[in-house]
């Protein structure tokens, strides 16, 4: 079972295209040893949005001689893709057939009282003394995957304490991530903020009939 922590920098929120990609290949779930790493830049076919420029500081003119964004592929042995809000990065690279492990969902489940669950906020929560240095290059893809690995270590410690034993393997971590992604509170609509378990049955039925309903909200409503 092969797992990669992956992060991307993109052209922005509107039909995003890849401009920078980074990954860490993890040797095992026990100590999260890094067996190899990658960082590369890619040329998009559209202009980078100002909001993305302000985040990544990657300029269009720096990418002129880079390979096309369409040429990027994860290594062939990829089975598990790990990331903070991993679905975004997974979507940018074309929705490949990998099992996705979301550190953001696991963070929300493990530390529900935190006022923010961004990766940077989680680094401050768990590595307060080192956080300023660790986050100096936040939103640079390679720094982000390295920080995600640090967060993943704390997630595994917290899960081990909760389970009474270490997480067995990537497959179990994926199952725990899938469970964490199923919400307990509705975050939209007229019942925003209500426990899903307490929603009126007719409203639940109406939501389940919506074709574009988030699949994890659908799971929560179907319980």
Over which residues does each language-model region extend?
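Acidic, Mg2+-coordinating catalytic module of metal-dependent nucleases/exonucleases
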Residues: 80-87, 91-93, 121-188
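Short runs of predominantly hydrophobic/aromatic residues within well-ordered alpha helices
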Residues: 103, 145-148, 200, 204
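Eukaryotic low-complexity, mixed-charge intrinsically disordered interaction/regulatory segments enriched
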Residues: 183-201
């Amino acid at each position: 079972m092969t797992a990669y922590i992956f992060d991307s920098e993109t052209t922005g929120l509107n039909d995003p295209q890849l401009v920078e990609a980074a990954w860490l290949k993890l040797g095992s779930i026990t100590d999260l040893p890094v067996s190899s790493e990658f960082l590369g830049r890619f040329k998009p076919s559209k202009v980078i949005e100002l909001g993305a420029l302000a985040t990544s500081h990657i300029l269009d003119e720096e990418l002129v001689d880079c390979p096309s964004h369409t040429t990027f592929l994860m290594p062939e042995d990829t089975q598990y893709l790990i990331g903070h809000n991993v679905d975004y990065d997974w979507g940018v690279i074309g929705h490949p057939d990998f099992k996705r492990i979301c550190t953001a969902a696991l963070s929300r489940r493990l530390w529900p009282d935190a006022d923010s669950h961004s990766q940077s906020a989680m680094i401050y929560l768990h590595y307060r003394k080192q956080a300023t240095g660790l986050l100096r290059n936040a939103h640079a893809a390679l720094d982000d995957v390295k920080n995600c690995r640090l967060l993943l270590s704390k997630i595994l410690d917290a899960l081990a304490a909760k389970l009474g034993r270490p997480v067995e393997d990537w497959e179990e971590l994926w199952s725990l991530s899938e469970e964490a992604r199923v919400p307990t509170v509705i975050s939209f609509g007229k019942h925003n903020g209500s426990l899903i378990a307490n929603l009126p049955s007719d409203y639940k039925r109406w939501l389940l009939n919506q074709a574009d309903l988030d699949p994890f909200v659908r799971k929560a409503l179907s319980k």
